[in-house]
Regions:
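Active-site-proximal cofactor/substrate-binding loop regions of enzyme domains
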Residues: 76
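Trp- and acidic/polar-enriched beta-sheet ligand-binding modules for extracellular glycan
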Residues: 1-67, 87-230, 239-240, 252-332
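Short, well-ordered alpha-helical microsegments
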Residues: 79-80, 157
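A short glycine/threonine-centered beta-strand motif
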Residues: 72, 235-237
Length: 332
């Protein structure tokens, strides 16, 4: 799996934030994590210069570098980053680097910028190209909560995407009691693959909160032949399923006629084997009719599938679903 198929741990929709920057004279640091793709507006200026959709520092006249500190929305293991310099052509940094740190608490800005923080190099100083997507794999196997992003010597970056595997605090989740959403992104779940995601990304299924609109769900193209669409989800931890929610909010003329939820215990198996016909799936929710723009809750209808590590969520024949919630208990 390419690292860009993983969750963006720093996404602002997941709570990621640029806490502090040493300089954002031309364009604010908050732009760095915006969900939308960067844009360019010809002829748009502010009282400080050309308006740019990114983070941009002033021209450096002394030796050094510029930096910002980012709190990840979801702590985890970083597998790769994309440094997007779109529209920064004569004002992009020559190089960048990234350090990481892990905190059990929420340090203040003053604490994060002090010399006491033990920053670990995740990405050494690497050259950047202007007006480009600059992908870099990361090889560090520890959980990270915060990043320090350095640009050399100065300039502008449109977006920073930080892809990785979410590592939740399971002890804290257990102490909270009750059922855990095993299919939630914040609990380490991941949509490994799907048949189609023409109109809406598969990861939207497991994002926190309610969908903002139709684009914030998983939606497939119109099916013109036989068959149906599906998504395969790796649960955050194996567990037993007790309650399911299928939310079709915002999907009114394009919701699926019905859905089916199946499970298997494939811990340790390669993800690509889950699409093999030989994989034995057990029904959790039999094929059930759905309604438009509705939150559907199922508990009595569920069948006992034992301990599950992965799910196959099928929709018939096509359409869109905003969110899938799968509540259960962790396997011992």
């Amino acid at each position: 799996m390419d690292f860009t198929d993983l969750i963006d741990l720093a996404s602002e929709r997941l709570g990621g934030a640029v806490l502090v920057a040493n300089d954002d004279f031309f364009a604010p640091k908050e732009n760095l994590l915006k969900l939308s793709a960067p844009i360019f507006v010809e002829g748009k200026y502010t009282d400080r210069g050309k308006w740019m959709d990114g983070w941009e520092s002033r021209r450096r006249r002394t030796p050094g570098f510029d930096w910002c500190i980012i709190r990840l929305g979801l702590p985890g293991i970083v597998r790769g980053v994309v440094v997007d310099t779109s529209y920064f052509r004569g004002n992009y940094p020559e190089h960048c680097s990234i350090d990481g740190a892990s905190f059990s608490n929420l340090p203040t800005e003053q604490e994060l910028t002090s010399d006491t923080v033990q920053w670990v190099p995740l990405l050494p100083e690497m050259p950047l190209a202007g007006d480009s997507q600059n992908p870099f794999p990361i090889h560090y196997e520890e959980r990270v909560t915060d990043l320090r992003f350095k640009i050399f010597p100065d300039g502008g970056v449109a977006r920073l995407r930080v892809y990785g595997e979410v590592v939740p605090d399971w002890d804290q989740l257990k102490r909270a009691g009750g059922y855990i959403d095993l299919a939630a992104a914040e609990n380490g779940a991941l949509v490994l693959s799907c048949s189609d995601m023409f109109f809406g990304h598969r990861h939207n299924l497991i994002m926190p909160g309610r969908a903002l609109n139709m684009s914030d769900g998983w939606e497939t193209k119109r099916r013109r032949g036989p068959g149906h669409d599906w998504a395969i989800i790796k649960l955050g931890r194996p567990g037993q399923i007790h309650r399911v929610e299928v939310d079709t909010s915002h999907f009114k003329g394009n919701f699926p006629e019905s859905c089916l939820l199946e499970a298997c215990n494939a811990t340790g198996l390669p993800a690509e084997t889950l699409t093999d016909l030989s994989t034995a799936w057990t029904t959790v929710l039999p094929r059930t009719k759905l309604q438009a723009h509705t939150r559907h809750f199922f508990d009595q209808e569920l069948l006992d599938a034992g301990v599950a590590s992965h799910l196959r969520f099928s929709i018939f024949p096509d359409g869109g679903v905003s969110r899938l919630r799968v509540y259960g208990t962790l396997a011992e």
